[in-house]
Swiss-Prot record:
Keyword Repeat belongs to the record: yes
Subunit structure of this chain's protein: Binds to the ATPase domain of HSP/HSP70 chaperones. Binds PRKN. Interacts complex with HSPA8 and JPH2.
Domain notes: The fifth BAG domain is responsible for the interaction with HSP70 nucleotide-binding domain.
Single GO cellular component term: perinuclear region of cytoplasm
Entry superkingdom: Eukaryota
BAG domain span: 9-86, 95-167, 182-260, 275-350, 365-442
Gene Ontology terms describing biological process: Golgi organization; negative regulation of neuron projection development; negative regulation of oxidative stress-induced intrinsic apoptotic signaling pathway; negative regulation of proteasomal ubiquitin-dependent protein catabolic process; negative regulation of protein ubiquitination; protein stabilization; regulation of inclusion body assembly
Keyword list, A-Z: Chaperone, Repeat
Protein name: BAG family molecular chaperone regulator 5
Stretches that traverse the bilayer: none
Length: 447
C-alpha cells in the first residue's frame, strides 16, 4: 500500500512507534532507580503511548490489528526494560554500596567541614573498601549497569580526591592582613572555599538535599569574581596566594561538572579506553604464548624465550595509565596476575625438569613435597586452560584436586628438616595461589 493511500490508523500507529523509538536509547541506557525523576518521566511517556496505541480504531481489519499488536509489544518491551534496569539485582547492589559510602561521609566527613576533628584512617579504609567492592560488581556488559557503576565510582573517587588534596596541600596559611588591603578579602574567600568543599562533598554523595549543583556553581563563580576584582599588581607573594585559592575554586568547579557529564559521557564504556586497549593487547599476546606452551611438542625449548617475553609484558602493564579509575586499576591487577601465573608455571616446569637430572638421594619428606609439586604442575596446566564459571563440573573437579594436594602437603612430616619445611611452605603457597587464580578466572568480572 502506498503512503498516500495508507489507512489513517496505520499512519497513526507509525507516528506513535516513531515517538517510542525516539526514547529507546534513553530507556536502554537508564542507570537510575525507580524513584528517579527520569524513570517516572520515561514511564509516563511509554504508558501514554500504550494508551494512544490502544485507542487506535482497527475497524476489525486484520492488518491494522496486527500493526497495533506489534506497536503495543514494542512499547511494553521498553517499559519492561526500564523496570528491569531500575530493579536489576546488581543495580540494587551498587545502590547499597553507595549508601554505605553516604553513611561514611555523613558520619566522618561532614562533621570535619563543620569544624570537627580531622578525617580518620577509618574513613579512608572504609572508602577504599567501598571502591574495591564497586569495581567487582558484575555488569555483564549491560550499558545501564556499566553507567551506574561508573557514575557511582566517579562520585566516590571525587570525594576521596577532594579530601586527599585538602589534607596534602593546604593553601598557604592566611597572610597577615597588614601586608596589603586585598589580603583580608582573600582570607575571607579561602574560608568560604573550605566551607564550600564540605558542601560539595555532601552534594556529590546525596546527603545534602538543600543544595544544588547550579547554586553551588554560582557561589564559586561569585568567589572567583571577587578574587579577580582585587588589585594585587606588584605583590608577588599576594598574587601567588590568590592564585592558590583560584586553583582550588577551579578544581571544585570541575567536580561540579561530574553530575552533568554523567549523562553525556561515554567514559563508562571502558572497552574503548586507551589504557584498557593496552591491557587487552598484553593479554592477547599472553594467551598466544600460553597456547604455544601448552600445545608444544617439546615445551622446555620455549621456556627461556617465553619467560623473557612475559617479563616484558609485565613491564608494559606497569606503564599503563590508571587515569584515577579503579576499574582500570583492577583490570591491570588481574592482567598482572594472569601473566605472573604463567611465569610461575614455567618456573615450576623448569624446576621439575632440573630435578629429573639429579640422581641423588633425598629425605622421604622432601620427595613427598616434590611429588605434590609435580601434581600441582599438571593441575596448573589445566587451570591455565580453564575457561568456565564456578558452576562448571570442571571447576569443581579442579578445586577438589587442589584441595587434595593441600591435604597431602599437610600430611607431610618434615621431621625437623629445615629444607623440607621451607619446600612444603612454598608448595602450600603455590597451591593456594593456583586456587586463587582459578577463582579469579571464573568470577566473570568485566570492565
Amino acid at each position: 500500500m502506498e503512503m498516500g493511500n495508507q489507512h489513517p490508523s496505520i499512519s497513526r500507529l507509525q507516528e506513535i512507534q516513531k515517538e517510542v523509538k525516539s526514547i529507546e536509547q534513553q530507556v536502554l541506557g537508564f542507570s537510575g532507580l525507580s524513584d528517579d525523576k527520569n524513570y517516572k518521566k520515561l514511564e509516563r511517556i511509554l504508558t501514554k503511548q500504550l494508551f494512544e496505541i490502544d485507542s487506535v480504531d482497527t475497524e476489525g481489519k486484520g492488518d491494522i490489528q496486527q500493526a497495533r499488536k506489534r506497536a503495543a509489544q514494542e512499547t511494553e518491551r521498553l517499559l519492561k526494560e526500564l523496570e528491569q534496569n531500575a530493579n536489576h539485582p546488581h543495580r540494587l547492589e551498587i545502590q547499597n554500596i553507595f549508601q554505605e559510602a553516604q553513611a561514611l561521609v555523613k558520619e566522618k566527613v561532614v562533621p570535619f567541614y563543620n569544624g570537627g576533628n580531622c578525617v580518620t584512617d577509618e574513613f579512608e579504609e572504609g572508602i577504599q573498601d567501598v571502591i574495591l567492592r564497586l569495581t567487582h560488581v558484575k555488569t555483564g556488559g549491560k550499558v545501564s549497569l556499566r553507567k551506574a557503576r561508573y557514575h557511582t565510582l566517579t562520585k566516590i573517587c571525587a570525594v576521596q580526591e577532594i579530601i586527599e588534596n585538602c589534607m596534602k596541600k593546604q593553601p598557604s596559611l592566611p597572610l597577615s592582613e597588614d601586608a596589603h588591603p586585598s589580603v583580608a578579602k582573600i582570607n575571607s574567600v579561602m574560608c568560604e572555599v573550605n566551607k564550600t568543599r564540605g558542601t560539595l562533598i555532601a552534594l556529590l554523595m546525596g546527603v545534602n538535599n538543600k543544595e544544588t549543583c547550579r547554586h553551588l556553581s554560582c557561589v564559586l563563580s561569585g568567589l572567583m569574581a571577587d578574587l579577580d576584582a582585587l588589585d594585587v599588581c606588584g605583590h608577588t607573594e599576594i598574587r601567588n596566594y590568590r592564585k592558590e585559592v583560584v586553583e582550588d575554586i577551579n578544581q571544585l568547579l570541575r567536580y561540579l561538572d561530574l553530575e552533568e557529564e554523567a549523562d553525556t559521557t561515554h567514559a563508562f564504556d571502558l572497552g574503548q579506553n586507551h589504557s584498557i586497549l593496552k591491557i587487552e593487547k598484553v593479554l592477547k599476546r599472553m594467551r598466544e604464548i600460553k597456547t604455544e606452551l601448552l600445545q608444544a611438542q617439546n615445551p622446555p625449548e620455549l621456556y627461556l624465550s617465553a619467560k623473557t617475553e612475559l617479563q616484558g609484558l609485565i613491564g608494559q602493564l606497569d606503564e599503563v595509565s590508571l587515569e584515577k579509575n579503579p576499574c582500570i586499576r583492577e583490570a591491570r591487577r588481574r592482567a598482572v596476575i594472569e601473566v605472573q601465573t604463567l611465569i610461575t608455571y614455567i618456573d615450576l616446569k623448569e624446576a621439575l625438569e632440573k630435578r629429573k637430572l639429579l640422581a641423588c638421594e633425598e629425605h622421604p619428606s622432601h620427595k613427598a613435597v616434590w611429588d605434590v609439586l609435580g601434581n600441582l604442575s599438571e593441575i596448573q596446566g589445566e587451570v591455565l586452560s580453564f575457561d568456565g564459571n564456578r558452576t562448571d563440573k570442571n571447576y569443581i573437579r579442579l578445586e577438589e584436586l587442589l584441595t587434595k594436594q593441600l591435604l597431602a602437603l599437610d600430611a607431610v612430616d618434615p621431621q625437623g628438616e629445615e629444607k623440607c619445611k621451607a619446600a612444603r611452605k612454598q608448595a602450600v603457597k603455590l597451591a593456594q595461589n593456583i586456587l586463587s587464580y582459578l577463582d579469579l578466572k571464573s568470577d566473570e568480572w568485566e570492565y
